[in-house]
UniProtKB/Swiss-Prot annotation:
Family of the protein in this entry: Belongs to the lyase 1 family. Argininosuccinate lyase subfamily.
EC number(s) per entry: 4.3.2.1
A Pfam family per the record: Lyase_1
Cellular compartments annotated: Cytoplasm
Protein name according to UniProt: Argininosuccinate lyase
GO cellular component: cytosol
Source organism: Streptococcus agalactiae serotype Ia (strain ATCC 27591 / A909 / CDC SS700)
SUPFAM superfamilies referenced in this protein's UniProt entry, alphabetically: L-aspartase-like (SSF48557)
Gene3D superfamilies attached to this UniProt entry: Fumarase/aspartase (C-terminal domain) (1.10.40.30), Fumarase/aspartase (Central domain) (1.20.200.10), Fumarase/aspartase (N-terminal domain) (1.10.275.10)
Major place of residence: cytoplasm
Keywords: Amino-acid biosynthesis, Arginine biosynthesis, Cytoplasm, Lyase
Pathway: Amino-acid biosynthesis; L-arginine biosynthesis; L-arginine from L-ornithine and carbamoyl phosphate: step 3/3
Length: 462
């Protein structure tokens, strides 16, 4: 066996087998942390110099070397090696090649345990901010679309059956509220992500007189972890993100399910842009909502990433264990999947065509006005339960003869109650049904306007 040349190889007489080395290496995926690793190292060496743990001259040389590596990384000129295992060892090896053995002083008062934790906090903090910006765009898109369709009437559904007519704008604002809650969850997630593990070292802190508050400020974290064991062992912030991402994807998936239905031949409520549709290799007429289907499908992989990390963490003793190498790929994958899904959804909504006439017509050939009739009868003094029974029988009779409630002659209605007047036919129209549901948060046009006004105030404040 050959001598071990790893940076940690002093304890070992021989090297890893190549296939074992490949199994243990993480550079294929954790290289995404490279810019964050160099940023954290820059803060760490600045602190080492200012606290005289290393000389100012040494700190300057290391910072100059890190700047060279940062420039090379941005230019796509850094090459990483599997023999260096992970991004931390690769950066240190590259730094040594640039400035010599003084690079070894960078790791003073630091372990890969607090190093990787710091990198992941920086990475996720960055990605949470990006994701919230994309959610803001999606929410603005929804509000704009809702405002354009306050008076667009469509069937509201329960059990996928026509229930009551609603404003399409009201339907869109329901999703605005969901994505607003998603934003709030990510904001709270940021609170737990915006902590600095740097300086916790392997698990117990360090004997060097480090200044953790200085590195916290330099990295723009809110505060340092107060317990070194927790600092290197904590992955709650990632699990919290994966949970939030799963809920967010669930909301996107529900919306996509409706979009897929709405653009089908059976509904024809909307027409998706060609930009977000594909065809068939055999059926020339097909226009498939593939992007909506993919968002729906990718929701499962985001759920899987959450379950995977929960399973990794469930039996881990304090502090660091190699199992934690498995915390990154799911996080990276969920960040990328959710981010592109939000972008696609916003652009898909901006470019789709709403077939208002078909939506409206769909409410005229159903019994979604049955509740309006029951409410009307109740307003005339008939107990609601009795009114419900009467309307149910009328619906049954109409279903048998192919007519609708609005087709029943006034004379027949007046046999139920002499108080029923000709205004019943206006009450039974879909637009009137929507307009009259003016309770707080309801689908009434005035209520939808209030929802939109409130949403615009919220968006302006962000």
């Amino acid at each position: 066996m050959t001598k071990n040349h790893k940076l940690w190889g002093g304890r070992f007489e021989s090297s890893l087998e190549k296939w074992v080395e490949e199994f243990g290496a993480s550079i294929s995926f954790d290289q995404k942390l490279a810019p964050y690793d160099m940023k954290a190292s820059m803060a760490h060496v600045t602190m080492l110099g200012k606290t005289d743990i290393i000389s100012q001259e040494e700190a300057g040389l290391i910072k100059d070397g890190l700047k060279i590596l940062q420039d090379k990384y941005r230019a796509g000129q850094l090459t990483f090696s599997i023999s260096n295992e992970d991004i931390h060892m690769n950066i240190e090896s590259l730094l040594t090649a640039e400035i010599g053995e003084v690079a070894g002083k960078l790791h003073t008062a630091r372990s890969r345990n607090d190093q990787v934790a710091t990198d992941m906090h920086l990475y996720l903090k960055d990605k949470l901010q990006e994701m919230m910006k994309k959610l803001l765009h999606l929410r603005i898109t929804l509000v704009n679309l809702a405002e354009n369709h306050i008076y667009t009437v469509m069937p509201g559904y329960t059990h996928l059956q026509h229930a009551q007519p609603i404003s399409f704008g009201h339907h869109l604002m329901a999703y605005y509220n969901m994505f607003t809650r998603d934003t709030e969850r990510l904001e709270f997630n940021m609170k737990h992500t915006n902590l600095s593990p740097l300086g916790a070292a392997a698990l117990a802190g360090t004997t060097f007189p480090i200044d953790r508050h200085m590195t916290t400020r330099l990295l723009d974290f809110e505060k340092p972890y107060s317990n070194s064991l927790d600092a290197v062992s904590d992955r709650d912030f990632i699990i919290e993100f994966l949970s939030n991402a799963s809920i967010l994807m669930m909301h996107l998936s529900r919306f996509c399910e409706e979009i897929i239905n709405w653009c089908s031949y059976e509904y024809q409520f909307i027409t998706l842009s060609d930009t977000f549709s594909t065809g068939s290799s055999i059926m020339p007429q097909k226009k498939n909502p593939d992007m909506a289907e993919l968002i729906r499908g990718k929701t499962g992989r985001v759920y899987g990433n959450l379950f995977s990390l929960l399973t990794v963490m469930k039996s881990l003793p304090l502090a660091y264990n190699k199992d934690l190498q498995e915390d990154k790929e799911g996080m990276f994958d969920s960040v990328e999947t959710v981010s592109i899904a939000i972008e696609i959804m916003a652009n898909m909504l901006e470019t789709m065509t709403v077939n208002e006439h078909i939506m409206m017509t769909s409410t005229e050939t159903d019994f979604s006005n049955a509740t309006e009739l029951a409410d009307y009868l109740a307003s005339k003094g008939i107990p609601f339960r009795k009114a419900h029974e009467i309307v149910g029988k009328l619906v049954l009779e109409c279903s048998k003869n192919g007519s609708y409630l609005q087709d029943i002659p006034l004379k027949y209605y007046q046999e139920i109650s002499e108080l029923i007047e000709n205004d019943i036919y206006e009450i039974l129209t879909a637009k009137t049904a929507v307009k009259r549901r003016n309770s707080l948060g309801g689908t009434g046009f005035d209520q939808v306007k209030k929802q939109i006004l409130l949403a615009r105030k919220e968006l302006k404040a962000e």
